[in-house]
Design a protein with these regions (language model features):
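Low-complexity, acidic Ser/Thr/Pro-rich "mucin-like" tracts of secreted and single-pass surface proteins
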Residues: 1-201
């Protein structure tokens, strides 16, 4: 079918030799019009990884999935963190399931009006996940959370030019926005996820 990947194995056999099986990956269609770079957030119902029973794109607060209820469902309006210095849910960061390797990636914080107020990371050459380690609690998002977590964590502050220091943001609605591009292509994909600063709940 046009616009889809084809995966399988090519098997070479002979009368007086070992059988050799090789993995084959092909794509038929327009490469740049194919699937997204970043998997859709888990709560949208459109996540590719979720259909395979794996966790995927979301927001973490500290060491837990933010906004997740007892049934394991993520409720977007409940995604929040509390940067109050108690070492519990003090930071928020995006968890990303990559469907394809990215040429560039930028992670930003937006205010309630969807205006960028801080850039957490801007980097290049982000590889697609090549394997899933079910023994690792980080699962499919190991690549980003392990190697880049320190860069994409948001502690609830923004830079204040007048004082030259980072200052705490007010409670309320914010967003984590991730923009990625493909190698050799000018188009980009942006995934934006809500996150609240809540110091009173």
């Amino acid at each position: 079918e046009y616009g889809h990947f084809v995966e399988g194995f090519a098997t070479l056999t002979g009368d007086d030799c070992e059988t050799l099986s090789l993995p084959v990956l092909g794509f038929y269609g327009d490469w740049f019009a194919a699937e997204n770079i970043i998997d859709a957030p888990m709560y949208t119902g459109e996540s590719v990884y979720m259909t395979q029973g794996m966790l995927s794109t979301s927001v973490a607060a500290g060491d837990i999935f933010a906004g997740m209820n007892e049934a394991g469902e993520t409720i977007p309006e409940y995604i929040s963190f509390s940067p109050n210095g108690d070492l519990e849910m003090d930071t928020a960061f995006p968890i990303l399931g990559l469907l394809r390797s990215a040429e560039t990636m930028t992670v930003e914080v937006l205010n309630g009006n969807m205006v960028p107020i801080r850039t957490l990371m801007s980097t290049t050459q982000i590889p697609k996940l090549l394997a899933v380690d079910y023994a690792d609690q980080n699962g499919i998002y190991t690549i980003l959370t392990d190697s880049m977590q320190n860069y994409i964590e948001w502690d609830g502050t923004v830079y204040d030019q007048s004082s030259g220091k980072y200052v705490a943001c007010d409670e309320g609605q914010y967003y984590l926005s991730v923009t990625a591009t493909l190698p050799g292509f000018d188009g980009e994909q942006t995934v934006t996820m809500p996150v609240k600063i809540d110091l009173t709940a």
